């Protein structure tokens, strides 16, 4: 795979020098490197024991919404890492936008037909996939760029590290369509809030900030702002030149792969519980009285507050675990 251009002076094709900071996936995709190609996603061998899962939606290639094809290819790649065949994975591609969320048409169709078990299964499959990414045997490095919305955020947040393009528009925007994040987004935002923030901030202050970010469907207009809003972690890498994204992510994956240990399962999450939820509910009532939100907005806000404050089990002296948050998130969704 070499690039060449026609040189008008030499009057013949001239091979371009390979930039060591750039992996061109279009050139890299030869028969030997593509391990499996599905309708909307593919698994590639990037060399050095690193896999690449890339999206190329057959329905909306410009936006790359999540569908079952994405989940299948991510699961295949994770299984290859689990078996020891490969040691790390890069989640990224070189399309127009990284991922503009989940395919809501599928969810709408299931709900309109009253197929609640199937809907629950679809959401749980996405949640389980995000947990598999988080606890993978080898590091998963995500490389987001341009639009990263809803489910797109939920796919990258559980990765071991993120290498984001400086120009990245990122946000959990589900509240804008009358839903709350359902693919693990609430759990990731809670974990990011607990790990981030200042030492002077208590659990309620951290969750209040997260509630405002998700509840108002705030979209970061840069990778740096995404860190400030809690979508990205403070130690995530930001790359100015998007062409360098995949190579930088691969280098980071190889760096992390040496002696990699998956994160510990969190069963010690201390969330505000009913007391914190009451305070958030009062704030919602204030917004409603001022005409800033509708009746339905208030209902969605209360569902979101229920999940972020830890449901019925959380409290000042009681801890909850990751799976409990995922379960109440799925129920509220």
What are the functions of these language-model segments?
Residues 58, 62, 96, 148, ...:
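Glycine-/small-residue-rich active-site loops that bind phosphorylated ligands and cofactors
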Residues 55-59, 111, 174:
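Short, histidine-centered active-site or binding-site loop motifs used for metal coordination
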Residues 50-53, 69-117, 124-145, 165-169:
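A structural preference for short, pocket-lining loop segments at secondary-structure junctions
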Residues 1-90, 191-218, 228, 234, ...:
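Intrinsically disordered, low-complexity segments enriched in small/flexible residues
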Residues 65, 99, 151:
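Residues that form or flank phosphate/diphosphate-binding pockets in enzymes
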Residues 66, 102, 159:
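Single, functionally critical "micro-switch" positions that shape active/binding sites
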Residues 119-123, 127, 131-266:
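Conserved catalytic cores of soluble enzyme domains
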């Amino acid at each position: 795979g070499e690039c060449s251009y026609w040189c008008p002076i030499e009057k013949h094709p001239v091979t371009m020098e390979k930039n060591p900071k750039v992996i061109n996936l279009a050139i890299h995709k030869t028969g030997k490197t593509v391990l499996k190609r599905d309708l909307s996603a593919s698994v590639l061998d990037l060399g050095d024991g690193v896999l690449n899962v890339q999206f190329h939606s057959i329905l909306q290639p410009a936006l790359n919404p999540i569908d079952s094809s994405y989940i299948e290819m991510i699961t295949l790649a994770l299984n290859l890492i689990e078996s020891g065949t490969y040691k790390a994975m890069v989640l990224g591609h070189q399309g127009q936008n990284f991922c503009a969320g989940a395919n809501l048409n599928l969810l709408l169709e299931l709900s309109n037909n009253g197929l609640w078990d199937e809907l629950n299964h679809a959401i749980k499959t996405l949640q389980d996939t995000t947990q598999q990414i988080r606890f993978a045997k080898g590091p998963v490095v995500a490389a987001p760029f341009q639009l990263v919305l809803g489910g797109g955020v939920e796919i990258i947040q559980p990765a071991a590290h993120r290498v984001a393009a400086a120009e990245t528009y990122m946000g959990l925007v589900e509240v804008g369509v009358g839903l709350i994040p359902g693919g693990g987004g609430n759990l990731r935002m809670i974990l990011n809030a607990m790990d981030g923030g200042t030492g002077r901030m208590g659990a309620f202050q951290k969750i209040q900030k997260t509630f405002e970010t998700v509840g108002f469907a705030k979209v970061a207009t840069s990778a740096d702002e995404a860190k400030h809003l809690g979508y990205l972690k403070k130690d995530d890498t930001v790359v100015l030149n998007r062409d360098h994204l995949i190579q930088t992510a691969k280098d980071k994956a190889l760096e992390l792969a040496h002696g990699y240990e998956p994160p510990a399962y969190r069963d010690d999450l201390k969330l505000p519980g009913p007391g914190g939820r009451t305070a958030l509910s009062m704030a919602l009532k204030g917004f409603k009285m001022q005409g800033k939100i509708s009746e339905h907005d208030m209902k969605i806000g209360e569902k979101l507050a229920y999940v972020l404050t830890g449901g019925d089990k959380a409290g000042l002296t009681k801890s909850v675990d990751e799976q409990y948050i995922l379960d109440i998130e799925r129920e509220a969704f």
